[in-house]
Amino acid sequence: MSLGRKQSIDNSAWLEAVATIENAVSREELDALTAATVADIKAHTEGKAAAYAWSAGKDSIVLGKLCEAAGVTDSMIGVCDLEYPAFAAWIEEHKPAGCEVINTHQNIDWLAKHPEMLFPADSAAAGRWFSIVQHRAQRIYFKTHKLDVIILGRRRADGNYVGRNSNIYTDGKGVTRFSPLAAWSHEHILAFIYYHKLPLPPIYGWKNGYLCGTHPWPARQWTGSIENG
């Protein structure tokens, strides 16, 4: 049985998929998809100023390896002052060589003024975190480095927007975002990590780690209540 939308998958199903990934995706299937994706990245970035967004999440870890194979070696990560200490330490140890850290500086004082952002109760509030940290940092990097395109690890299987009938689009602020993993399944991501023996940050070993994914600690979803969070 294949995994469905990320938000509707129980964390135990993720762990089962990780444990049995060889049965779901063969090395041959993965290698063919990898080669096609690297070719797609090359086709969209040749002769252009390009970089990739790295979040230390599982999708971006795969994205980074594919972009580097395609010759795109500049990258960035958006963080704030509310990251888990263990996650921040993992980023420093494992970030790509060409990765620039952009801190948007939301801190505990900011959180006190925006209590609705603590442990989001719905996807709309959770999406605001992505907007104010990752998307803002991407925009800053894009403009500062005068990029033509920034490459993201967004996938349709996560319910992410990747473009209308394509995997590339330009937003209202002039930032062109390209998502070469758009058609990759959850299983493809897990298989790439498994076959290439890639390390993952500690979040994935925590309770509901695959369900929540990487995030600043106040952005944690599915806590049930602020007290539980």
Mark where each language-model region is.
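Nucleotide-activated chemistry modules centered on ATP-dependent adenylation/adenylyltransferase
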Residues: 1-229
